[in-house]
């Protein structure tokens, strides 16, 4: 629904493939979203990451590359000698300040947003998805250890 109401928004699906997984996390999300009506053109896949730090680092590179491609396509259209389209002097999505919503499990939002800021995402918004209530305490304890590790490693 959000993607339909916001057609200029791109959804970056980030996550690699584990040894026991038939497809990458990004590919699984892609299939789910397309099946549920999201336009494939709004989806960018990052399929190489194996950690939260890599999710955000590789996603940033993918976003920057995509924004540059959009700018280049616009410049190409504007430089076509016989183009019937008027010159585009308005802001397109690639020119607007980047706003990033990080959708992740509720226990993971804080660390993901802090890592995103460390990687240069300025306008970061956490969007939480509910976790399994039975596993929630276990996941929070594990996440605390990951926060300490990422602080020590300089990832956040």
Functional labels for PLM-detected ranges:
Residues 1-142:
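A structural signal for short, hydrophobic/glycine-enriched beta-strand patches
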């Amino acid at each position: 629904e959000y993607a339909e109401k916001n057609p200029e928004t791109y959804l970056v699906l980030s996550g690699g493939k584990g040894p026991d997984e038939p497809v990458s996390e990004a590919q699984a999300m892609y299939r789910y979203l397309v099946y549920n009506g999201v336009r494939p053109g709004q989806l960018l896949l990052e399929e190489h990451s194996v950690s939260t730090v890599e999710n955000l680092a590789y996603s940033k590179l993918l976003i920057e590359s995509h924004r540059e491609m959009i700018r280049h396509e616009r410049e190409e259209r504007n430089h076509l000698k016989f183009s019937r389209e008027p010159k585009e002097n308005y802001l397109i999505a690639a020119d607007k300040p980047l706003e990033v919503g990080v959708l992740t499990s509720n226990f993971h939002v804080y660390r993901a947003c802090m890592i995103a800021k460390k990687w240069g995402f300025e306008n970061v918004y956490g969007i939480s998805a509910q976790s399994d209530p039975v596993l929630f305490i276990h996941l929070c304890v594990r996440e605390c250890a990951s926060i300490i590790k990422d602080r020590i490693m300089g990832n956040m």
